[in-house]
């Protein structure tokens, strides 16, 4: 039974899923915004927020843990030098997920996951 088992499998084996999360988090920090499916965005949110928390700690051990997860050294440097200091006063909630509709082809629900910089003001809805 599946009781109390957290996380989505996303139709992939464990190693494939973990590699995908590493790639997506690396891209998120490199570009500060990526478009992906809702389920993937919800899963990488927790991983990305843990990496930013490591960046806020800023010690050598945190740097090594982040470097073991993030695939590019330049992105690790960016995380510790520019991204983490941006959230020094914020206690969590470093990412935002915005739903953008469905993908052409398979109608998968798509989202944009981005790093929070300032307050989000949604567009006025046409009622």
From Swiss-Prot:
Domain of life of the organism encoding this protein: Bacteria
GO BP annotations listed: translation
GO MF, one example: structural constituent of ribosome
Any one GO cellular component localisation term in the record: cytosolic large ribosomal subunit
Entry keyword set: Ribonucleoprotein, Ribosomal protein
Pfam families on file: Ribosomal_L17 (PF01196)
NCBIfam families noted in UniProt: L17
Subunit architecture: Part of the 50S ribosomal subunit. Contacts protein L32.
Matching HAMAP family: Ribosomal_bL17 (MF_01368)
Protein family: Belongs to the bacterial ribosomal protein bL17 family.
Protein name, per record: Large ribosomal subunit protein bL17
Natural source organism: Pelobacter propionicus (strain DSM 2379 / NBRC 103807 / OttBd1)
Chain's gene name: rplQ
């Amino acid at each position: 039974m599946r009781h109390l088992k957290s996380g989505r499998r996303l139709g992939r084996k464990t190693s494939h899923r973990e590699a995908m999360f590493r790639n997506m988090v690396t891209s998120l920090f490199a570009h500060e915004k990526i478009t992906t499916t809702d389920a993937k965005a919800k899963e990488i949110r927790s991983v990305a927020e843990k990496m930013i928390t490591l960046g806020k700690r800023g010690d050598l051990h945190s740097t090594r843990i982040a470097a073991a997860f993030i695939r590019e050294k330049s992105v690790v440097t960016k995380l510790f030098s520019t991204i983490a200091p941006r959230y020094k006063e914020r206690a969590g909630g470093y990412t935002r997920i915005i739903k953008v509709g469905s993908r052409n082809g398979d109608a998968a629900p798509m989202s944009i996951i981005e790093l929070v910089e300032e307050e989000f003001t949604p567009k006025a809805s046409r009622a």
